[in-house]
């Protein structure tokens, strides 16, 4: 088995040379290809009070051996990893280096990124909407969209008429945006009744108080009346704007006329 060092630049060079080797570089090579790689993970609990280091070795998408700092030695996950685990555990220098990684790798990097990542806070944007525009008293799915927030620990709860809903809730889980922010959708399956008020409440470290967004269940006639009122208001604003435009244009035209007099 090939052992990849934890030093990023060295590991990158080894992988690059592997990719560029002649057997793999052939475009029409029909031979089976095999992939081996390792991952190094640092898990922090309450800052650096408790740190766990995991080093996993994967061959063809299957983990075969790992080092767990909570265990203190290499353990085979499958029979394929047993020879490696036995060999590495028999080498004092390798084992000592792996055990020290909690401090030399995890805590060291935590201190470097502490000033940027730990205090960073981005407030979420919260919107609520139904998935279907259909009459009341029919099955519907209310969506609470929470986007562009950091860090990822967030709590989203649904309320109906002030009472928390515990059932019928579906979540997408955290989705990474790729720009150090997250998003999630928390949906409530329900049959809205006229007059009911649904509230999505979001709690996040960036917020001093929870954010709440309401959605009111309205009948079709009530929605039509509201839309008619909004449409009439907008139409009135358009007529008012047109009237003011014509008025000021006429005023400007009159002020531009010069008085006529007799020529001597």
UniProtKB/Swiss-Prot annotation:
Start and end residues of each Ig-like C1-type domain: 124-214
Modifications the protein undergoes after translation, according to the UniProt entry: Ubiquitinated in immature dendritic cells leading to down-regulation of MHC class II.
Annotated signal peptide: 1-31
Disulfide bond residue pairs: 42-106, 144-200
Subcellular localization: Membrane
Glycosylation sites: 46
Residues exposed to the Cytoplasmic side: 249-264
GO CC term (a single one): MHC class II protein complex
Ranges in the topological domain labelled Extracellular: 32-225
GO annotation, biological process: adaptive immune response; antigen processing and presentation of exogenous peptide antigen via MHC class II
Stretch list, region Beta-2: 122-215
Principal location class: membrane
PROSITE patterns for the chain: IG_LIKE (PS50835), IG_MHC (PS00290)
Chain segments carrying region Connecting peptide: 216-225
Keyword tags: Adaptive immunity, Disulfide bond, Glycoprotein, Immunity, Membrane, MHC II, Signal, Transmembrane, Transmembrane helix, Ubl conjugation
Family in the record: Belongs to the MHC class II family.
Stated name of the protein: H-2 class II histocompatibility antigen, I-E beta chain
Gene: H2-Eb1
């Amino acid at each position: 088995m090939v052992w990849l060092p934890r030093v990023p630049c060295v590991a990158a060079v080894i992988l690059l040379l592997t990719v560029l080797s002649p057997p793999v570089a052939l475009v029409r090579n029909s031979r089976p290809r095999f992939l081996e790689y390792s991952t190094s993970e640092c898990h922090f609990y309450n800052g650096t009070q408790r740190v766990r280091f995991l080093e996993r070795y994967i061959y063809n998408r299957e983990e075969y051996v790992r080092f767990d700092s909570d265990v203190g030695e290499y353990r085979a996950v499958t029979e394929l990893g047993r020879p490696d685990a036995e060999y590495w555990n028999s080498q004092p220098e390798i084992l000592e280096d792996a055990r020290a990684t909690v401090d030399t790798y995890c805590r060291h990097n935590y201190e470097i990124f502490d000033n940027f990542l730990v205090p960073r806070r981005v407030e979420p944007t919260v919107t609520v909407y139904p998935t279907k525009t259909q009459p009341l008293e029919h099955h519907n799915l209310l969506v609470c969209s929470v986007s562009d927030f950091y860090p990822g620990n967030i709590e989203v709860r649904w309320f109906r008429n002030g009472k928390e809903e515990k059932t019928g809730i579906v979540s997408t889980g955290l989705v990474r945006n790729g720009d150090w922010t997250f998003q999630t959708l928390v949906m409530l399956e329900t049959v809205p009744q006229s007059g009911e008020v649904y509230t999505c409440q979001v709690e996040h470290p960036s917020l001093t108080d929870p954010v709440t967004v309401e959605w009111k269940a309205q009948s079709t006639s009530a929605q039509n009346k509201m839309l008619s009122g909004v449409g009439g208001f907008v139409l009135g604003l358009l007529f008012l704007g047109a009237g003011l435009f014509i008025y000021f244009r006429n005023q400007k035209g009159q002020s531009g006329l010069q008085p006529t007099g007799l020529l001597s």
